[in-house]
């Protein structure tokens, strides 16, 4: 079958002469992959048969099971993850060439996992938009394409299944986690040959035989080669039509933007990081942004690139990270414009970082920075810090430093950070964390979590530069920094028009600022409200109670009498909430409850429960709700009686006094399911689902003894008894110790039977039951009071984390949507906030007014 380089118009060089000079692919040093001697002859012959411009970018990964059988007639699978394009894609071209020369089917496969670090709505939406473009482009080329989105019911190992019927796997060579570990896992799972192809760099990483630590040294070594490569057009392949594979383990699905919001909601990812409206994914969006920059920005790039308050940079890094545009094409275009400084950044600084990561195993560790930098930072590790900030404070832009907080706001709301500002942003971490290691972890976390170009070698280049990488010592030593180059925020702020920068970065995430009402200030409602507020939207909370928190409540009678009569403690198992928990602990909002927890059997036998980390808020459980409500507008003691939809697709709230509030673009209800229906004066999509769940009641008793009641334990689950739970409240961190305070919770069935009785009488009855179960010995209390929780225990919880009607703009959340615990409430609120933020990103669901002036590029 004939395969050749397509002929080019007269006067244009294909660059084959240049590529031929570089084909000594197997003589290059390998940090990973199989040695030449262990590869079978067919593997060497396969790469040797490739055109030189492709062969130089290839390297093999050999399985521990052996080099595999390249001669079998299985399909060629191209797994695309960091080259989401068909134009000038060396990895795709390699796969197409191999399939055509061997006359076997070719499949382009793209998967999107829930399990990569920092997986969020933001990254998922960007990648889904990229997948839609890639699917269209593959169809235009007549290539078979399959997409797999990991989510409940769709968590099979599709790629592993496809590899069983393949002869070779071709994939993008990307030098960082999680791709590196995924490829390694595939290498160990199968004997299938894996061919890695560099599609990210103009100068292939395989051509750089070591990690360079200074940009000038890298430039001196490779600039002449870059000068030869830059103007060369990418050779096009003249190949026969691709053969489509049959009997694949995955059906073809349409990657349709109308499905994205629902797909994303189903994924177990971080829904607190919303999509970025002004930066859509895909080759089409990349092309549009690049062409706009060529028309109106590149000529002024050198003069304006360092001013973070003006539109002076290309903002192409997210598209380069995921390979939605070819760096070869960008280099040619920039060279044609004579944009030397842009080429310096695109080629020298960016590809220096790629080569560094290619040759460095642990880029998340201080071992990645130069020895002099490690030494000086460790020497100054104990220097006094002005203040130590928890992750939550920094993530929300709450350092108190105006410039730094604006930088973080840009990351949080818009998924990007101006490169020059990133340098100052990163160095500030050293003075707000307890060690250089913690500063590095904080930089990596915040950058990768929020930035669309996070987890990229260029990102690591910028982050590690803040700690001395690619730099030299600066004398004299400074506190905390030592001889690492200083970059004070106050000095940088004097060079910036802060008012202009603030107007730009504080615009909301979305086409306009939405007004959102949250009815019910329980944990789910508070978490949703805070996420939406952090993304720049106007949120108002309404609650019939005196304060926030819902059932995460504390009754304070007097200084010595305090009872957590609602939620007793909480656990956090979900990885999406771990960072919040760690921050709350560091800030003193929560602390571990080290009390001994047991189970009391029907015969009175006491057995210890399985060990687990239980947490309580400090100095009382209600403090967690107050913490989440900080900075939010809360209308306490304002019960809402009606939610009324208007003709303009907005809604009004009417409270118990008849006062009207609104209009609101969205109304989120954090209420018991049976209370929601009567509020809604028009139907909505999910109203019928509320009949599938209910909140059962719970009667609580608050009891105090003058002296400690010694039981040998601090909390107990009581089996098959009217009292299902009892706890020594005084054993929790930060509680008053003058009196011995206890809380008893009744069984749901007993609570139903006695719900309308006097709560204080019920409390005394529960105390008698408890005394009977213990066989007597409970002392005479000095205080007994009851409380009726009419809505407490979900039975059952819905099999979804939130409810959302995009046509109405109405949503509902609560622990009854998830696990029935505090953790479930937090996840439910996060999920509903994600639905709203994705809705703002999806113009097909509701009409969106024209963008505000603040959304226009800065002039």
Which positions does each model-derived feature cover?
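Beta-rich, aromatic/charged-enriched effector core domains that present basic-aromatic interfaces
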Residues: 33-37, 144, 149-271, 275, ...
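Glycine/tryptophan-enriched, flexible segments
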Residues: 35, 71, 211-369, 500-503
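Active-site-proximal binding-pocket segments
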Residues: 307-496
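Conserved flavin/dinucleotide-binding core of flavoenzymes
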Residues: 470-477, 492-495, 547, 555, ...
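N-terminal Rossmann-like FAD-binding beta1-loop-alpha1 element of flavoenzymes
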Residues: 514-541
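Glycine-rich FAD pyrophosphate-binding loop
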Residues: 533-556
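Central helical "cap/lid" subdomain
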Residues: 549, 555, 563, 664-714, ...
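A conserved short coil-to-beta-strand element within the FAD-binding core of flavoproteins
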Residues: 636-650
